[in-house]
Structure formats: C-alpha cells, structure tokens
C-alpha cells in the first residue's frame, strides 16, 4: 500500500498550487483544516445521507448545518439539503420550478452560469437569456419587456456571476415579481456568503439584504464555505414543495415517520462526510457578521478593490468593471491581444491567473477568494508587471 500511495502522491504533483495566494485564477479555495479532518474522520464510517439507515449521525448534522445556512438568509422555516454540487442544487431548484409552472419559460441573465440553460434542456423547459449591462447585471428594462410578453414561470437571479462576480439587482427584480407573479430563484452558489460582509458596495449590500425574499436559493459551501469540493446546498422557503418529491419504490426506507433527506432530494446516494465537515466548520466558525468567517470574506473583498484600484492607476491596464465581490477582470489597454501572452508569462513566474472572453475580447481574470491574497498583492503586481514587459517584448 505504501508504494501505491507514494505513486499517488507523485501523480498529484501535476497540479497548480491552488492553496497558494499566487494561485489567483479560478474559484478554488482551500478547505479549512477542521473540514478536512472532519471529512476524513467521517469516511471511516462512510455514511450515506440518502436515508437514516445509511447515516443517522451525519443526517442529523446535515439538517443542523442546512438550518444554519437558512438562518443566514433569514429563513426560520425552510426545506433544504446538501447536494454533490451547485449544478445538482440548481437542477433541483429548477425541477421544482418546472413542477409548479409546467411548460413555462425560465429566464436568466446572459451572464448567468451556463448550467441553467443546460438544466432547462434536461428538464425540457424553455429557456431564454436576458441581456446584461456593461457591469454584468441583468438588464431590468429587457427583463420587464420579456415578462410583459408572458409565458414566464421562473426568473433566475445570480448573486455573484462566475465571470465578474456581478450581483443582479434583486430589489428591482422583486418589484417585477410583485407585478408579474413569476417564481424567483437565486443562484448564490458563489456569492451567497457575502451577505455577512460589511464592506460591499451599496447596491450589492441591498441585494443581499433582500435575498431571503426569493423562493429558492442555491449556495456552494465548497466555494466560499471552506469545504472540500462536492458540497452544494439547495433551499426552499416553502416546505410544502416537499410534496413534489413523493414517490414509492421497493427501495423506500421506512426508518422514520419524519421525512428523511432521501425523500426531499433528487439525488440518492450522497456523502455524509460532506455534512460532517460542513457542520464542524460552522461550529468552529459561525456564520456571524463580524466573526472570523465573515472577516475572511471582507479581506477577499478588500484585496479585489485594492487590486482593481492599482490596475486602474496604471496606464497600461483597463479594468472591465468595478468588482462587486472579489473577482477582478482586466486587460492590456492598447494591446488587448497580449492577454494570452501575459497569462502564459505570469504562469512561468508561478502567478496563475484565468482568462475570460467578453464581447469578443480576451480579458485576464483573478478570483481573489483567499484572505491571504490581501497580503500578497504587492508580489502579485510585481510578477504581473514582469509578465507584461516580457509579453510585450516577445510579441512586438
């Protein structure tokens, strides 16, 4: 076994240093040590949270953990559970939406994650994109024009887009909901925890204040919740939607008169270890404004603001938009074709960035989701400067 594990360790060297602040590319945040330890501990039991028969302790911990997340959104009654990913969580939310509004169109911003269009196809529900403004927000005039045309069952707002970290104008969408009566789902997979931060801009802060007024929410603890990958969460404000899950099969579990997690989820087998890890993390780092967990989010936000400011003060760079959370997109101002070359040069200096295509132009992108990024900004900027100089010299 030792030889095999040594081989595994060697193979795992073929990775980017996701844990390090110089990895400033995609949405990868190291799990907290308590999450890793609790997850590893639970794997010795290997619980399956599909039913109480498969994971009594981990099922109880999941319910407690999900209730804490619901409370963060101001929900004291809810229906919800963990999932293996944000994609599955969104699938479940849109499945419920489709059951309540069969055949009706689902709308989401053109900047929303592509999974919504894909999921709608799987569910055989019509899907349409709503144009976004220059800041990446859903365009309210375009949304209302489409709503006025009728046949819309559900609108998806994104609380932190994958590309920009843009927060859709939820208060304005809620006003349209009162007028047109559609179901409202919030994809807060990335940004959901930022309601705890005290240093958001006024529009984003106001959107998070109203997040508890939607019908369903998806949040990914495996992004900003310090969890190992494989931990999403879906929440519904009305527990009555549980009736939509009713089924009978020879495999039905009869271990409790109370609805168990397998009876309110589309997924069957799910790792109970994810619930154990999440519960332990929130036990150590409660979801409190001003607490240690919230302070980590605020540090990431400060890092993004400072990074965008420094880039904006440099005549060589153009910042795509003011960051609303902790994602910054920028490009060479006079030489936009250099983005790929700068990306490559930065990687050679162990600064790992990401790329995003917006309106036919390639932009550099950084997700500054580690609190440590704030203390590493100078090092990041020095390497970025060198990458620019080398890229410009080699291509011109």
What are these regions (language model features)?
Residues 1-76, 345, 350-353, 364, ...:
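N-terminal entrance/gating region of PLP-dependent enzymes' catalytic architecture
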Residues 46-53, 76-81, 127-130, 152-159, ...:
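Glycine- and acidic
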Residues 69-92:
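Short loop-beta-helix segment that forms the pyridoxal 5′-phosphate
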Residues 82, 318-323, 354-358:
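Short beta-strand
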Residues 85-243, 395-396:
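Conserved PLP-enzyme active-site core in the AAT-like
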Residues 175, 180, 358-396:
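PLP-dependent enzyme catalytic core of the Aspartate aminotransferase-like
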Residues 200-315:
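Active-site C-terminal subdomain of aminotransferase-like
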Residues 316-345:
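Conserved PLP-binding catalytic core of the aspartate aminotransferase-like
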């Amino acid at each position: 076994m030792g030889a095999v594990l040594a081989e595994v360790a060697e193979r795992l060297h073929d990775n980017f240093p996701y844990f390090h602040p110089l990895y400033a590319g995609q949405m990868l945040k190291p799990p907290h040590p308590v999450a890793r330890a609790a997850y590893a501990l639970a794997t010795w039991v290997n619980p399956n949270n599909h039913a109480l028969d498969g994971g009594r302790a981990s099922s109880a911990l999941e319910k407690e953990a999900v209730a804490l997340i619901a409370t963060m959104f101001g929900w004291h009654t809810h229906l919800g559970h963990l999932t293996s990913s944000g994609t599955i969580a969104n699938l479940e939310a849109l499945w419920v939406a489709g059951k309540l509004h069969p055949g009706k169109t689902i709308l989401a911003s053109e900047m929303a994650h592509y999974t919504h269009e894909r999921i709608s196809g799987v569910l055989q529900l019509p899907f349409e994109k709503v144009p976004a403004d220059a800041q990446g927000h859903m365009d309210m005039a375009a949304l209302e024009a489409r709503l006025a045309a009728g046949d819309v069952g559900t609108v998806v707002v994104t609380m932190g887009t994958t590309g920009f970290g843009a927060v859709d104008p939820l208060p304005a969408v809620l006003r349209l909901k009162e007028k047109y009566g559609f179901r409202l789902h919030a994809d807060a997979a990335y940004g959901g925890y930022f309601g705890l931060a005290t240093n958001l801009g006024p529009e984003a802060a106001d959107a998070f204040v109203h997040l508890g007024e939607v019908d369903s929410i998806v949040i990914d603890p495996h992004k900003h919740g310090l969890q190992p990958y494989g931990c999403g969460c879906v929440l519904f404000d009305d527990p009555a939607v549980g009736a939509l899950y009713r089924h009978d099969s020879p495999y039905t579990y009869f271990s409790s008169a109370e609805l168990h997690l397998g009876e309110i989820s589309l997924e069957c087998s799910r790792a109970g270890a994810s619930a154990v890890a999440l519960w332990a993390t929130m036990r150590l780092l409660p979801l409190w404004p001003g607490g240690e967990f919230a302070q980590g989010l605020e540090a990431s936000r400060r890092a993004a603001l400072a990074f965008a400011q420094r880039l904006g003060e440099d005549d060589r760079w153009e910042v795509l938009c003011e960051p609303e959370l902790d994602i910054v997109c920028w490009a060479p101002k006079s030489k936009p074709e250099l983005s790929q070359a700068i990306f490559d040069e930065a990687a050679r200096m162990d600064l790992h960035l990401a790329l995003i295509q917006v309106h036919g132009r390639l932009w550099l992108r950084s997700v500054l989701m580690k609190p440590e990024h704030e203390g590493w900004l100078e090092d990041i900027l020095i390497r970025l400067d060198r990458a620019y100089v080398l890229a410009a010299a080699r291509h011109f």
